[in-house]
Amino acid sequence: MSKQDSLWFKSLRWLQRQLVHTVVVPHDPFDDLNLDPSKPLAYVMKTESVSDIAALSEMTAKLGLPSPYEELEVNGVKAPRVVCLEGSKPLFGQREGGEQYIDCFKRLLSVHKQNRELDIQLVPVSLYWGRTPGKEDDTMRAAVLERQNPTWLRKCLMILFLGRHNFVQFSNAVSLRYMADEHGTDKRIAQKLARVARVHFQRQRKVMTGPQLPKRQALFHALLKSDSITKAIKEEAASKKITEAEARAKAMEYLDEVAADYSDSLVRIAERFLTWLWNKLYKGINIKGAEQVRQLHHDGHEIVYVPCHRSHMDYLLLSYILYYQGMVPPHIAAGINLNFWPAGPAFRRGGAFFIRRSFGGNKLYTAVFREYLDQLFTKGYSVEYFTEGGRSRTGRLLAPKTGMLAMTLNSVLRGVERPVTLVPVYLGYDHVMEVATYHKELSGKKKKKESVWQVFGAIRKLGNFGQGYVNFGEPITLHNFLNEQAPSWREDIAKDPDQKPSWLTPVVNTLANRVMTNINDAAAVSSVTLTSMVLLASEQNALERSQLEKQLDLYLTILKEQPYTEYTSVPEGTGHDLVSQGLELKKLQIESDPLGDIISIDQSIAITMTYYRNNIIHLMVLPSLIAACLLRKENCSREDVICVVNDFYPLLEAELFMGIDDPAQYASQILDIFVAQGLVVEAEHFEVVESKINQLLLLSGTISETMQRYAILFNLLEVKPNMERSELEKDSHRLAQRLGALHGITAPEFYDKKLYATLSVKLKELGYLADNQGCSDIKRIKERANLLLRSSVRQTIVDSVHAEQNT
């Protein structure tokens, strides 16, 4: 009888099964790690442990992977399925010695010499009982509570108290065929393989648990001794005519206000609450791109998460997802408005550090905050902050605030040794709990002061909120970014470390825009966002169900056949499936009659639904522009369409943070899809297929309000070519309000003053404002914008502009 079949062993495994709850990282190793089920597979683990292998066995059975208890047999040669680098540790004395693992590696490698077709996949597996990183300078406690190399007694206690927090992590497989072909099969290669595995396990533990935590007061005293804070204390004392001791006490108060107080115990409690909460609120959370972030952590990068900001739930969602993806929740920069009892202390122990909305010229506070942020980077803690500065009320990305990005870039310039990498994150929801409040605020109601009831009050109305979406975008490594934007940055800083380089501000602005673009590049399309887009483009926010489903199928085809970026996610299924999901979420209404179902958006929430449409409007705005061009312009050729796209893309890029490298090529590929879908026929020019005209009309409706804005701007510029930016912003906003009142435009962003400010900056940059060279293009672009509008809207704009000129 084998050991694992003995009654004692079965009893031990049964007991462990009752005590242990295991989370697998990643959740689907076959897909996420590209494991090949047709090839043999072996596991390598750091330490030999009965409980670890039992936990691994439970997971392999669920995942359909080979059991660690089954011997690996290839060509008559038997080898253990699991190779352990260290023996078990006895209660007293030293760990068992020997190099049995070297023999195992040699046997696994040698069979490849005999069979040229063989390729064994060696998969590193790490197990964690709890994820406490430990404290700095806590030698006695570390000796008593040793987690990395526990005795069997210590392991029993760990299972008893931390069994519900067991993580099994699979890593990318090593091809032993590649190792044998490239390096040979002798003992030296086996030893090298073992060394690489040890380094891997050491790095993997740091990714899972994070660096050791500092003692808070010791950290404060160390920071107060830094050169920058010492200098700021002296300046504060001199300027405020107080003693240095008083200035130091004030600096200590600032540190206490700012600094996080991370607690692994609280994170474990929060994890249970959040698991309950997500299961109650959402049917699932869709994640894309987590593996690339895990790899960055493993490669030693300092990670800064820069997500978009939709809801207060963002703070919780991203930390929760990272925890379950085998990474440490980041230290989160939270607005000081969230530092209220009891939420503030809880957020602080969950990793939040607090930042004032404005530093207000307070040099001491600025020095304290910067030094604290530097310390986080130096120690290796991941950080998270929202570059928008606040939650978007319209569903579009807000213009970025550059303060935190500038401080992060300054930390790199000051010599952070590890590569610092920004990871843009797109967060999306089928239902944002605060969305009704946002529209009240946009309509003029005063924003309520933050309170625990405002943040969590919606939990009392728990319902079906659909799904959440977390997509990780293209990372930006700051050292590489600086090399690209300012190749001589190292020399410039070395010459005069205290002098702010002249290139820094424009580089920060470029970085901010790239972050926002990369967030939008990782957008998640959902049933709610896509059905909102279609229905809001219809005249009465209503369509026959068959027509709606057909339109959704067209959009899905465009998004899948011409992916916006590799980071964008598009739902599986058909238009019928998306409509069914929207009805289930009660975002849509259905009315039935003998002629068929009619799907609509309730007029009372139509404005609210613009929020969800705006989340992904950038994905469909160019197809919409192309559809409008095909419908409005007679004898429209491919060249005509590309010229229109080239005229308007720079404004769309600035307004919607778009990142299409070659708009002309993209437009041509969209036209190819239109032809393939039978929407148009192409000869010398395009001819719209009459039976498909409604599909093009609906598609063109998505950009209609955007084109109305552009028509207002260019009509104003034509009649007042010497307008200053401020005058253009004021006049265009006033005309937008008039147009909205006359034509029933309710989308909140249509009246957003900040949006017109963004566009005016871009117009100046493009040379369309006074004293620039692009004035000759204004008439052409105005005519193209006017052409793409309905005649009634076009006439209102023309009449209003001339009335404005005559006042």
Swiss-Prot record:
Its EC number is 2.3.1.15. InterPro entries: GPAT/DHAPAT (IPR022284), GPAT/DHAPAT_C (IPR045520), GPAT/DHAPAT_LPLAT (IPR041728), GPAT_PlsB (IPR028354), Plipid/glycerol_acylTrfase (IPR002123). Transmembrane segments: none annotated. A motif (HXXXXD motif) lies at residues 308-313. It comes from the Bacteria. One of its GO terms (molecular function) is glycerol-3-phosphate O-acyltransferase activity. It is a peripheral membrane protein. Pathway: Phospholipid metabolism; CDP-diacylglycerol biosynthesis; CDP-diacylglycerol from sn-glycerol 3-phosphate: step 1/3. It is found in: Cell inner membrane. It catalyses: sn-glycerol 3-phosphate + an acyl-CoA = a 1-acyl-sn-glycero-3-phosphate + CoA. CDD domains: LPLAT_DHAPAT-like. Keywords: Acyltransferase, Cell inner membrane, Cell membrane, Lipid biosynthesis, Lipid metabolism, Membrane, Phospholipid biosynthesis, Phospholipid metabolism, Transferase. GO terms for cellular component: plasma membrane. Pfam families: Acyltransferase, GPAT_C. One of its GO terms (biological process) is fatty acid metabolic process. The HXXXXD motif is essential for acyltransferase activity and may constitute the binding site for the phosphate moiety of the glycerol-3-phosphate. Belongs to the GPAT/DAPAT family. This is Glycerol-3-phosphate acyltransferase.
